[in-house]
Amino acid sequence: MTVPAFTVVIPARLASTRLPDKPLADIGGRPMVVRVAERAHASSAQRTVVATDAPAVAQACAAHGIEAVLTRADHPSGTDRLAEVAAQLGLADDAIVVNVQGDEPLIEPALIDEVALHLAHHADCAIATAAHPLHDSAEVFNPNVVKVVCDAAGRALYFSRAPIPWARDAWSGVPAMPAASARVPLPDMPVLRHIGLYAYRAGFLRRFPTLAAAPLEQTEALEQLRAMWHGERIAVMQTAAAPAPGVDTQADLDRVRTLWAQSMAQEGP
């Protein structure tokens, strides 16, 4: 597998409502954003850059030899922030930029490579992303779990917080929002959970801030729907299993710290 040249950009903002100062949270003696950058460095990326509007994050990165750029604080979405970084770095239109979320300290470097390669193999698409099959009906009906349906070529048809596709026969009589404890049969067709990892062409990132916000984007609160609303194609790479957990809450952080310690113990001195 020949992985194309690509740059990783890691957005990192301090203004998290559920976990204040999240990028600076300690994981094994280093800030979380540094741990994410270390995972990106272990991929085939030619360059890894943290994008932040917080001098404290930039300083933490500098202290650990991680490149960081300061961006405006008023970006309406993470993709708008990436667009500013692509411009700052002077990337060519055909350059590939992989957006690794700043709260994914356990992300597999191979997954980063794979999404970059997937975009390189789909010249008709401006974006590539990933998804995996769901096996738990509670996740299927959870609006915090984003689902995606694809066409025969593996391009996204739609992303939604709703359970899609709706299994008319299997879910006959099932309420739209069943109790989390309810046992709901899964349809024969896999329900795909979207993984929030993206590869973009830099030329698209430059165009993105000029695109008008889309009604579907605003209704679902999913910024990738703006790209689709304006006719851009998104290639979806399917993985067999879910990625390692990210960090949204204190409970997530505690879990990731435990997993990190376990992985270090397995590696040994």
Curated annotation (Swiss-Prot):
Gene3D superfamilies: Spore Coat Polysaccharide Biosynthesis Protein SpsA, Chain A
Keywords: Cytoplasm, Lipopolysaccharide biosynthesis, Nucleotidyltransferase, Transferase
Pathway the protein acts in: Nucleotide-sugar biosynthesis; CMP-3-deoxy-D-manno-octulosonate biosynthesis; CMP-3-deoxy-D-manno-octulosonate from 3-deoxy-D-manno-octulosonate and CTP: step 1/1; Bacterial outer membrane biogenesis; lipopolysaccharide biosynthesis
Claim: Nucleotide-binding is one of the keywords in the record: no
GO molecular function, one term: 3-deoxy-manno-octulosonate cytidylyltransferase activity
UniProt enzyme class: transferase
Location of this chain's protein in the cell: Cytoplasm
Chief location: cytoplasm
Entry superkingdom: Bacteria
Catalytic activity of the protein: 3-deoxy-alpha-D-manno-oct-2-ulosonate + CTP = CMP-3-deoxy-beta-D-manno-octulosonate + diphosphate
Keyword Lyase carried by entry: no
InterPro entries according to UniProt: Cytidylyl_trans, KdsB, Nucleotide-diphossugar_trans
Record Pfam families: CTP_transf_3 (PF02348)
The protein's Enzyme Commission number: 2.7.7.38
Alphabetical GO biological process terms: CMP-keto-3-deoxy-D-manno-octulosonic acid biosynthetic process; lipopolysaccharide biosynthetic process
Gene Ontology cellular component annotations, sorted alphabetically: cytosol
Annotated function: Activates KDO (a required 8-carbon sugar) for incorporation into bacterial lipopolysaccharide in Gram-negative bacteria.
Protein family membership: Belongs to the KdsB family.
Protein name, entry field: 3-deoxy-manno-octulosonate cytidylyltransferase
Source organism of this protein record: Cupriavidus taiwanensis (strain DSM 17343 / BCRC 17206 / CCUG 44338 / CIP 107171 / LMG 19424 / R1)
Gene designation per UniProt: kdsB
